[in-house]
Design a protein with these regions (language model features):
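Auxiliary Fe-S-binding modules of radical SAM enzymes
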Residues: 1-174
Length: 174
């Protein structure tokens, strides 16, 4: 009714509502320019749209080591198929890894609330990890107060981070 009367909404459901209900995310136009993206509302749609646009232009990967990208368990279901298509197209074997949130509890399943220790536990034995930038704050700390530098020291491999889908595709392609 608000959309009909004013031409836009003022209430938006968080992405996790759609994911938990196993419903398709709304199109980007539904989010009215993403006014609440900093709260994670529309972040999945924005990421998917950007990913599809940039990945469509990528044919070959020159990577030497396949990467893992840690994500919340809710995001894994919608993101892994995108990466499977990318891998098939480019001949790579990258993967998203769903990380259980032991720190806050397993019902907390969004990527932005993952902590360094949980990510390290999920990525044991991996040689290359690309962290979503949303897991770090402006001081380069995870929510468990682990620093990015301490994470790099604890991880036995290459650590990179990506701010958005464009950066992620770029890192996966080299």
């Amino acid at each position: 009714e608000c959309r009909e009367k004013f031409g836009k909404s003022f209430v938006y459901l968080g992405d996790e509502f759609y994911l938990l209900a196993e419903k398709q995310l709304p199109d980007a136009s539904w989010y009215d320019g993403f006014p609440q993206i900093e709260n994670g509302i529309g972040l999945s749609r924005s990421f998917i749209d950007e990913w599809q646009q940039i990945a469509a232009k990528t044919d070959v990967c020159n990577h030497s080591v396949d990467a893992v990208i840690p994500v919340g368990t809710s995001a894994y279901k919608i993101l892994q198929p995108l990466l499977d298509n990318f891998n098939n197209k480019t001949g790579s074997k990258h993967s998203f890894i769903p990380v259980n949130n032991e720190f806050f509890g397993e019902t907390i399943n969004v990527t932005g609330l993952l902590v360094g220790k949980d990510i390290l536990n999920a990525a044991q034995g991996m040689k290359r990890i690309i962290l979503p930038a949303v897991v770090l704050n402006q001081d380069n700390l995870f929510l468990d107060d682990m620093s990015f530098d301490d994470f790099k020291k604890a991880f036995d491999g290459k650590v990179e981070r990506a701010v958005n889908a464009r950066e992620l595709v770029m890192l996966l392609s080299r």
